[in-house]
Amino acid sequence: MKVLALRHSVAQVYADTQIYLHDDSKDEYENAFLISNLTTHNILYLNYSLKTLKILNKSGIAAVEVQSPDELFALIRCNFTYDYENNIIYLHDYSYYTNNEIRTDQHWITKTDIIDYLLPGWKLTYVGYNGKNTRGHYNFSFSCQNAATDDDIIIEYIYSNELDFQNFLLRKIKERMTTSLPIARLSNRVFRDKLFPSIVNIYKKVINVGPRNESMFTFLNFPTIKQFSNGAYIVKHTIKLKQEKWLGKRVSQFDIGQYKNMLNVVTTIYYYYNLYHSKPIIYMLGSAPSHWIHDIKQYSDFTFETWDPLDTPYSTIHHKELFFYKDVNKLKDNSILYIDIRTDRKNMDWKEWRKVVEQQTVNNLNIAYKYLSTGKAKVCCVKLTAMDLELPITAKLLHHPTTEVRSEFYAILDVWDIITIKRFIPKGVFYAFINNITTENVFIQPPFKLKASPTDYIVALYALSNDFNSRQDVINLINKQKQSLITVRMNNTFKDEPKVNFKNIYDWTFLPTDFELKDSIITSYDGCLGMFGLSISLSSKPTGNNHLFIINGNDKYYKLDQYANHMGISRRSHQIRFSESATSYSGYIFRDLSNNNFNLIGTNVENSVSGHVYNALIYYRYNYAFDLKRWIYLHSIGKVAIEGGRYYEHAPIELIYACRSAREFAILQDDLTVLRYADEIEGYINKVYSITYADDPNYFIGIKFNSIPYEYDVKVPHLTLGVLFISDNMIHNVVTVLKKMKTELFKTEISTSYTYMLSDNIYVANASGVLSTYFKLYNMFYRNHITFGQSRMFIPHITLSFSTKQTVRIESTRLKINSIYLRKIKGETVFDMSE
């Protein structure tokens, strides 16, 4: 959903668009709630309130002021991520395909021959980091840039087994044009760029679990963040390999050598960060042309000092000369050294060339060892070739993708590697490594152990659900970690599958009820974005690869109506009820009937079930931005801080009724996941509320009327407003509550319109308009620890006779209350009050 705020209506009609006119009779929160439950994707919001826009954005729903037709057209035609704190819009708009254009935000790609392999007549455009070079295209009242690129296609091609780039590109563009936008992945970079600066500013020690290549630039500015990944491939792991020969396989049609070099250097930077927690100087030998340096500098400021007889245009200091062993003393501490020296073959015979390469490998290693043997805080990444060679058993081997699989690979060495044991590795083993292993991640740090860390802030985005982790250990970590942002795969299956397939692995699935948390928010990606100054125009698909975002230890937990709130809670219900349902009242009718309340007169205004809880359960796949458990818990302890909107405090029994309705809905839909979720939420309600039932009551509250429009043969026809189980010394407490509620009780507009047999030999009249007052009275008694109400549904009725009678129907008739009293069952009246 996107909300576009306009001062004036527009003549143009847009598909999937609805107009909402601000309702001045309601406050900003109520207007926001009504907007959030509209069913179209685009909402044109007229006569808007800035506060309402802010409320929507904090809820993760993109809401933007629009000042011109051009702005409206730009935003209505595509999806976007909105940085509402800084008023920046990041479009995810691929309409540039109509210019026969693909886009990249990586400069090095523009310096390759990729243009030769594009679709006929197409071009490649560099748009800068997150599309910032496109800002000049939009002369808008807000900052705007198009963050859409085709880097995902290019990178996927590089790691694929396909060689024909044009066919690959064509297929992927067609896929993009025929499938829903993966909005979470596209906006994730914007999210990370907001998330980590805010966390690092607050917490001294931050742990990040499971970063992948798409985050390789994000963390360059955060050397103190401790990364955990899948670990490095080290020399001693080669013992499992069988010897092979040179393969000579082409990986990419266009030259990706620069990409390989960039990955090598970035891998080395993060390896250095994990050891020394600071930024290094970057020395590079054999550096030309290294156009990728420009990409790194777009994200973070590094000093690059380079040596090469050819130009290296983006380095900080360039020495247009060769680097020799004797020059190692020029290199300072607190640095990394990237050795990529390789003489051009030219017309050299391959045997002679092989000797040169092997000698050069030895020379490279000698430079590396000398560099690491003195000084402090140093890491080296060195180019090697497949040959009989001794290497430290702890050296980290790299084989990032390059244009052709030949004889080349790389090793990362630190100051401890050069003093450890070395192992002789035959050439054939190195070929086996090169032929079969591709380094897929620039983060090669050790795996994370699933243990809470009291002093650290843990971020684990899309990293812990894999089934090689113990599911219970993941739950324990989340329950015990005081400060964290952790995601787990949401169970949105219909058969309550404990794990689901994802690519070539399996993920554990989770529901919010799997966790026992306090002061924590469990929400969706959208809900999480709102907490970090962002909103989004498109929610994740309800049956997609969705995750629960669990935020432990933040200052937003008690701001119930501001973050992870009830915005959009009824949206899916509205979509169903006003399109394919038997009636738009279907939800109300089902909730009453499933709790054996057969009086459906006015069911849409006097319902016996919490619609919030019911919708949050049966449509949780659509509205899990709403943190239901938090909502229940804060109500149970009486700490609901509400800024605005229509607030209705539910009685705990209403929540129980909602769970029972949801359970029956799940049975009818054969939805085993909702069935379990409803059961567990009911269990949670009973855990946080101290609900007691007067199933064996000894007192009741009765309402006597001035007159009854039916024949009756009981002595005094009355409405039982509820039963109690109390000791005699609690009568005073009950009377005190009744006196406090006196005005509201006598204002209750009770009406009747028919009679029926409640059960064998009990003839009653219906009573409408009672439930709201009943639940308020229930809450008053609950807060005063007085047992009121039974476990079964309260059905308001007036007993007329204890014999079988025919049903009578009349026009709805208002009943005037004569008195309200407290009476002992089969005993005397102990309190009576009149208006």
Swiss-Prot record:
Keyword presence, Nucleotidyltransferase: yes
What reaction gets catalysed by this protein?
A: a 5'-end diphospho-ribonucleoside in mRNA + GTP + H(+) = a 5'-end (5'-triphosphoguanosine)-ribonucleoside in mRNA + diphosphate; a 5'-end (5'-triphosphoguanosine)-ribonucleoside in mRNA + S-adenosyl-L-methionine = a 5'-end (N(7)-methyl 5'-triphosphoguanosine)-ribonucleoside in mRNA + S-adenosyl-L-homocysteine; 5'-triphosphoadenylyl-(2'->5')-adenylyl-(2'->5')-adenosine + 2 H2O = 2 AMP + ATP + 2 H(+)
Asked whether the keyword NADP is assigned, the reply is no
Instruction: Write out the ranges of the annotated region (N7-methyltransferase activity).
Output: 171-245, 429-555
Q: Which GO terms describe its biological process?
A: symbiont-mediated suppression of host innate immune response; viral process
Cited InterPro entries: VP3_Rotav (IPR011181)
GO MF terms here are:
GTP binding; hydrolase activity; mRNA 5'-cap (guanine-N7-)-methyltransferase activity; mRNA guanylyltransferase activity; RNA binding
Instruction: Note one Pfam family from the annotation.
Output: Rotavirus_VP3
**Active-site residues annotated for this sequence:** 718 (for 2'-5'-phosphodiesterase activity), 720 (for 2'-5'-phosphodiesterase activity), 797 (for 2'-5'-phosphodiesterase activity), 799 (for 2'-5'-phosphodiesterase activity)
| Ranges where the record places region GTase/RTPase activity | 556-692
State what this protein does.
Multifunctional enzyme involved in mRNA capping. Catalyzes the formation of the 5' cap structure on the viral plus-strand transcripts. Specifically binds to GTP and displays guanylyltransferase and methyltransferase activities. Has affinity for ssRNA but not for dsRNA. Capping activity is non-specific and caps RNAs that initiate with either a G or an A residue. Together with VP1 polymerase, forms a VP1-VP3 complex positioned near the channels situated at each of the five-fold vertices of the core.
Domain comment from the record reads as follows: Contains a bipartite N7-methyltransferase domain, a 2'-O-methyltransferase domain and a GTase/RTPase domain. The C-terminus contains a phosphodiesterase domain that degrades the 5'-triphosphorylated, 2'-5' linked adenylate oligomers produced by the host cell in response to IFN stimulation.
Q: What does the record note on quaternary structure?
A: Interacts with VP1. Interacts with VP2.
Q: What is this protein called?
A: Protein VP3
Q: Which source organism does the UniProt entry give?
A: Rotavirus A (strain RVA/Human/United Kingdom/ST3/1975/G4P2A[6]) (RV-A)
